[in-house]
Amino acid sequence: MKYFDFYYGDESEQYSFYTVPKMFFDNDKFKDLSPMSKLLYSFLLDRMSLSKKRNWIDDKNRAYIKYSLKAICNDMCVSKNSVIKYMKELQNFGLIRKLSKEGMEDIIYVMDFSKFNQVDYDIQ
């Protein structure tokens, strides 16, 4: 059997990674969240790093992202229907909020998973 090679020295730092919050696995609140929805959330969190750089901050100082359905499908290597299902699941868990405006790209607010206070925010 052939094996992959080892990492040597600084090679161990050469890749970037998606981070999935540990809380998604060790907190009962998230036990019913599907693994693919957890993965999608990690993609959305990663995209948050662009928010400040691209001035994706609303008038209430809340960061948001723009991430097209097509791009998510491509990045996750899954179908459009699958992404729609995972996005809906994240919405149902309160982990994202979507704002759609006619003729504009959807805005996605990635909610802070570590804060359990479920407040009904108006994002209009």
Placement of each model-derived feature along the sequence:
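Charged low-complexity intrinsically disordered patches
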Residues: K2-F4, S114-Q124
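Short recognition helix of helix-turn-helix/winged-helix DNA-binding domains
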Residues: M1-K70
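Winged helix-turn-helix DNA-binding recognition segment
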Residues: R47-M111
